A protein has these predicted regions:
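N-terminal subdomain of nucleotide-sugar transferases
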Residues: 1-55
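A broadly tuned "polar low-complexity/structure-edge" signature
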Residues: 6, 87-88, 161-162
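A generic structural signal for short, solvent-exposed coil/turn residues
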Residues: 16-18, 100, 146
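Residues at the starts of beta-strands that form the adenosine-phosphate
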Residues: 23, 43, 105, 134, ...
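Extended catalytic core of nucleotide-activated donor transferases of GT-like folds
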Residues: 30-33, 45-132, 140-144
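Histidine-centered active-site/metal-ligand motif
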Residues: 42, 111, 157
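Donor nucleotide-sugar binding/catalytic pocket of nucleotide-sugar-dependent glycosyltransferases
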Residues: 115, 131-162
Length: 162
């Protein structure tokens, strides 16, 4: 199930040239989810940035095709195919800034909900304007809650039973 989900995300991205294996730039977000994504066989390159989440190996070991980059190093020579942002709470902004120089497809995948009543409305409005070339939510409820105002897709979280 998760492999078809990733194939859906990739097809939405309209990456210029179809490949058997993509190089995907991301930031550690959700170890179990990213472990499932790694089972697709694509190569994930995860930024190791000060003040950002690190991979928690007590939750999951790092998959062989999930690479933690050297601290504060983009390693742009890797020629990434697209960027995968998994949070509008700080991660999107960092990856969007990086993409100003890389200029590659940007996928915004949101695992969380806006914090209505806990965050100022203007902060939520700013986050609603954070959109990628492709925008994915993990549920219809999340998609509706964010109300980003552009075309978006729902790909439900999968469960690996193997």
């Amino acid at each position: 199930m998760i492999n078809s989900s990733v194939q859906q995300i990739i097809s939405f991205a309209n990456v210029a040239k179809k490949k058997d294996k993509y190089k995907i730039l991301t930031i550690p977000t959700h170890e179990r989810y990213e472990t499932q994504l790694s089972k697709t066989g694509h190569d994930f390159y995860s930024l190791n940035i000060d003040q950002h989440k690190k991979w928690n190996t007590s939750q999951c070991p790092i998959p062989d095709n999930y690479h933690i980059l050297p601290p504060n190093d983009l390693c742009s020579y890797l020629n990434y195919d697209f960027i995968l942002s998994q949070s509008k709470f700080g991660q999107f902004q960092v990856l969007q800034q990086i993409n100003q120089s890389l200029r590659i497809p940007f996928i915004s995948l949101e695992h969380t909900l806006p914090l209505y009543g806990l965050q100022p409305a203007e902060n939520i409005n700013v986050m609603q304007s954070m959109i990628g070339n492709v925008n994915v939510f993990i549920s219809e409820f999340s998609q509706s809650s964010w109300n980003i105002g552009v075309d978006s897709h729902v790909i439900h979280h999968g469960i690996d039973t193997k």
